[in-house]
């Protein structure tokens, strides 16, 4: 199984952060990000507070803005090539499930592990269950599917991918933001084409 991070990996920038600027909540969203980066709130608190800002919004409006955010080249092609080798391809992210559902529909991913944000009649509700610990999320998913971590690879770009890198068999830091992330992965790649990751997997197999 191969899992892909979302922001900075599939999307070139943080998708919801970009979308909120057109939705009128960009300043509040950015302020929460800053509080987290200055360690005044935890990641769990940051995610919960950010997702509360979406309460009452139309899902269609959010997805419309998200769809404008640039994605890395050849996502569907990479997913399909991996699936051609009977490899399950999923998303592993702290982003909401509705964002994962959009990417599954657009690119053909087979599943996701992410935060849960309620939607009723096309409107975002206040029901929120965040996933600040992607490692825990992947462990649960592996237990549910019966796929051992020793048969998993993860592709990501940020510090919250590092704990995942440490428990899977193989990891790729893709366009990683820091040396720590690069050093924590089995391999690191700088590219604007996701097929380069597929070709790397082929070369090590």
Positions of the model-derived regions?
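Acidic, Mg2+-coordinating phosphoryl-transfer loop and its flanking beta/alpha structural elements
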Residues: 89, 93-94, 150-192
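Conserved beta-strand/loop elements of the cytosolic catalytic core of P-type E1-E2 ATPases, chiefly
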Residues: 63-76, 92-94, 114-115, 126-132, ...
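Active-site neighborhood of HAD-like aspartate-dependent phosphohydrolases
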Residues: 1-44, 48-49
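Short, charged, surface-exposed secondary-structure boundary motifs
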Residues: 120-126, 181-188, 198-203
């Amino acid at each position: 199984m191969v899992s892909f991070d979302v922001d900075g990996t599939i999307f070139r920038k943080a998708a919801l952060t970009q979308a909120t600027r057109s939705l009128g909540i960009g300043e509040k969203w950015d302020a929460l990000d800053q509080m987290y980066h200055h360690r005044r709130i935890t990641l769990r608190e940051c995610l919960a507070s950010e997702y509360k800002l979406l309460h009452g919004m139309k899902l269609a409006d959010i997805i419309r803005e998200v769809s404008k955010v640039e994605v890395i080249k050849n996502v569907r092609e990479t997913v399909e090539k991996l699936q051609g080798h009977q490899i399950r391809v999923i998303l592993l992210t702290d982003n909401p499930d509705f964002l994962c559902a959009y990417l599954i529909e657009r690119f053909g991913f087979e599943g996701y592990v992410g935060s849960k944000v309620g939607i009723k009649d096309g409107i975002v509700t206040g029901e929120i269950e965040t996933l600040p610990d992607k490692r825990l999320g992947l462990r649960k998913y592996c237990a549910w599917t019966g796929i051992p971590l020793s048969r998993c690879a993860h592709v990501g770009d940020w510090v919250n991918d590092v704990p995942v890198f440490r428990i899977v068999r193989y990891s790729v830091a893709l366009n990683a933001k820091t040396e720590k992330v690069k050093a924590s992965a089995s391999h690191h790649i700088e590219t604007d084409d996701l097929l380069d990751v597929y070709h790397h997997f082929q070369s090590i197999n």
